[in-house]
Each structure stands twice: as C-alpha cells, then as structure tokens.
Amino acid sequence: MANAYREYLIKQNILDGKNGTGSKTVLKLFMGVPTVGDTYQGLVKTTSFSDAEKILEEYKEEGVNGLTVILKGWQSGGYGDNLTSYSPESRFGGKKGLKRLNSFAAENGVRLLLEIDPMLITGGTGFFIKGKNTVSDGAGSPVTDAEQLRYIANRNYLQKNVLKALKKTGEYGSADLLIAGIGESVYSDLSSSNAAERYEMQQLFESLFEKSGENTAASGGNLYALKFSDFIDESPQGTSDSLIEDMKIPWYQMVVHGSSSYTTETGNSSYDLNLQKLKWIEYGAVPYFEITKENPSALRDTRYTQLFSSENSEWKEKICDIYREFNGTLDITDGFIIKHEYLAGDVVLVKYGSGAEIVLNYTGSDYLYEGRTVPAEDYAVIKEGENEKKN
C-alpha cells in the first residue's frame, strides 16, 4: 500500500521520486537561550559561530562528509526570545561570524540550515500587537501559551515574517532555511477581522514554502510541505496509538524515503542509543544529534531544559562511529523502502528498492534467519544493495 501511495504522490508531483537523498548525518547545534529571571534577563551561550566552525573542522578531520548542520537559536536574543528577529546574535559572533561559518560550510560540502519558526511570536517582538497580528479563539482572545509569552501569528503577520526571513538570511551567504512550525501544524483563525479556515492557512503555507525556494527544509513533514522540501526535520517516529493497531509500521517513512532525507529523534536524547540506532535503520532515517560546545548544565536556569547530554567533546567519537557504520556497509540513504515485515515478535525485515535487505532484532535473544544469526538487540545486513556493491 505504501508503494502504491508513493507512486501516486510522484505522479501528483508531490514527491519527486529521484530515488536518492543527500544527508549522511545531521547535527543540530544549539546556540543559546535567555535566562529566566524577574529583574534581569541574561543569555546563556552554548555554541558560538566560531565554535560551530571548529566543530565542523573536527568532523572533517575525522573523515565525516556530507553533513547537514542546523543552527537553532542563532537569532538575536537566542532561542525563544525574539522569534521573528532574523539578525544573528552579536554575542555568538554576529553577522560577520555567521557569514564566515557559512563560507566554511560551503567550501567543505556541509549543508547549513538556519532554523526559524515564523508561526510563533513573542510579546516583545518588533511591532507586535496582540489581537492585530495574532490568531484569536472563538471568544476573540489571542491564542497563547500558559505563561502568555508566545502567540500564534495570523496569516498577514506570518507572511510578513517569512518574506522578512528570506530577505535577511540571504545577506549571510548560501545557508538554506529550515522552516519550523508551518510544516507540522495547521490552524484556523476565528478573529472577527482576519478570520481564516484551516484550508486557507494550508494554502498560505504552501505558497510560502514555494517562495522559499527549492532548497528549503521543513520540520514535521506534513503532506503539503513535502512538495517543496528536500529535507524533513524530526519526522514522526511514534504511532497513532489506535486501539485497532497491533504493530508499529513506519508508514510515513516508507512513503517518503528515497525522495527526501529526514530525521526522527536525536540519538543523545534517547535513553538507549543502540535502540535508537536500530530505529533509525528500520525507519530509514539519517543519524541525528543535537549538540553544543558547552556543557548543557548551563541551561538549567532557562526554559530550554531538554538537553541533558549534548557536549560535543563527549559525543564526537560516538557520532563518528555511527557515521562510518551508516555510510559503510550499511548504506541506506538511497532507494525506496519497498517492504517492512515482522518476522517474529520484535524481529523486523526491511527491504529497499536497491536490493538491500536488513533484519533487525529488538529481542534479548539471537534470531536465526535463513541460516544467518541476527544477534540480540542488533541487526544483520542479509543482502547488500547496488550502492553498497559499488563501494
């Protein structure tokens, strides 16, 4: 069924069907975030632009090529402070530092993505006016979070944000945009003066992705975003948890793999890196880590507390090992996923259009498949694909 649906999307020009993707490993570099305080708001810097350049140089020396690097919280004020500011934070190195990093990335085959979220705005953002620029609920009140710090941009303000981002970020070099928010959430606006149905917002999202250019990336990966995005950040790894489901099938990934690169969950946020690695293989996802130059303990007095272990010096060796594993004998970045089958319990067979066949064993005991032993909590490449044979 996934194969048939993929072919349908290709015929509809929603997927390009190029049967190949580019990213080998994805690193999200978290730059910084404001502190939480009543009287003084400081800035915690976890990675500067020069730090990022040094980190990329380290991976280059280790032979890690084809990196996709996402900068998160690079704007003025850091992550979450001034979401619609598209000027680089001066304390991270400013415009000069970002342009230098951009040049280094371009010269060394690294794809650099600047993450933005034009859908969310904060109370102190530019000429932000509650009610005029925000989405309203049925009672006419602005839609906001529990702390009333963030609001959702209405269609007029959203469009201004994206066009502003395209203009500003173009000044910093060849970096592409990763547009968060609008690729994963569709909402309506019930305001009396600027009402919009969900389908109208979706049409706007599509037009904004189209204006952003062919090298735009998106988060979440809703269907309308796939047509315009060649990379999807954090595609769904979970299921709908419906009571009628008795098995987890990577339906989304089976449809998309081979047309777009995508990530699922970060390796350094998983309680078991080996388990997450198996999930990447099963789902055809690119290895993905969110890292920092500094120890993430510095984030304890901020609103960004989900990073428990991210210091690059601690993760570099593991990242390099996984890169070599995924891009050596296990090369699954290209080709459609044409079959996903449960062999027994938590033992899965995945087949690719390239001819590759992989058996993943999530159980605590070895599994015998066609005379091959698949070790417990491990995988075995049963048949190599055409790409692997050429290497």
What is the role of each PLM region?
Residues 69-72, 179-181, 218:
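Conserved beta-strand positions
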Residues 63-66, 172-174, 178:
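Short loop/turn motifs at secondary-structure junctions
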Residues 1-33, 283, 288, 300-308:
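Beta-strand-rich recognition/accessory modules
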Residues 14-15, 65, 111, 332:
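Intrinsically disordered or highly flexible coil/loop and linker segments, enriched in small
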Residues 1, 47, 102, 166-170:
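Hydrophilic extracytoplasmic domains
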Residues 20-160:
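Aromatic-lined carbohydrate-binding/catalytic grooves of carbohydrate-active enzymes
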Residues 108, 118-121, 125-175, 183-391:
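Active-site-proximal substrate-binding groove within the catalytic cores of carbohydrate-active enzymes
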